[in-house]
Amino acid sequence: MVKKVLEDASYQVQLKNPSEVQTPEQIDLEIVALDNLMLRIQNRRAEFCRARNQSALISSCLPAELIAEIFLFALAMSPSQVPSSSVATTLPLVLGQVCSAWRNLAWELSELWDTFHCRISKGRCPAQARLLSEWLLRSHERPLSIRLSFLDDEFHWNDLGAPIDIVNVLNRHRHRWLALDLVLAPSWYEPLRMETTLDTLISLSLRPTASAFSAQRMDMFLLAHQLREISLSHHYLRNVHLNWDNLIKISFSTASVDEAVELIRRCNNLVTCILDELYPFEDEYALPLTPFSHRRIEVFHIGCRVNLDTEIFIILNCLALPSLRNLSIMLPEQVGNPLQTIGELITRSECPIQKLRIHGHTLLEQDMIDFLQSVKSLKSIEN
């Protein structure tokens, strides 16, 4: 094969034996000539390799619609799509690096760009904001599911002078927000306050940087009339302003006992209620003198901080939940048997409960058997 290439007219060269060369100058000329020949052969080889690779590309073998489905499946399976993952979404950019055909397809496939997790660095925030702007343009006009978190230690963002470039970019597309999951720097609250309706936003998750309690007024989502699900932590309920009757699912961590009861009272259409890391009673809201009924809650989870087991019982004693099907309670190990309080809630509610989970406190096997026999609708107890 090499002999054939060397004999080709485009590679004509007269190869000499070393014995035919007499002087050092002639030897140097021969070496240069051979170097040039090898370079030309390498270049030609690279051309043939590119041609071979191009012909073997998936983009030349499959229709664009099928390749697009493969891209979307790869994105759905990527680690960045796992909730609470620390991995940023980079797959669309990686696909664009393979070849121009893949890049052209990926850049036009808006579904690749409408759901993402962006990890922000304080030092690179302006540059990341420009890249985010380009990213969002590629999503065309699709509804956006956005998650933002920080590469830096969150304490570095916990001041009013933190960059707001990213928020300014997001605000230009607020009419397309479908789901937002944000860690809020103190400087971000004010830019988010814009008097425009958020007609597409249905899911919202917010917590302050460094999990430090925020006293800032949170009214920037009051015009989100389609909001159905919200997750909050380290905010005071008195500062949170939402269309409470629209909510069907809420997760609130670090609420005080009276905030938790008030929250349930406000959300008349709540179906799923998750209350984690309860704090002691803060006397912000008065507890009801008698239990009140919430007729829609079907799934109820409640968990307390260490040594605050009585707070859970206080909340349960305030409620009647006639639609309750699934109850989950997280308790410290040293707490007394909670089954009596739970039984009173079930009796008072006359609910069709089917599943009970009690974690943190170990129940006696006979107690669980007796409880299952006494509550006819109950199908399982997990402990």
Regions found by a protein language model. Give the residues of each.
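Leucine-rich repeat
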Residues: M1-N383
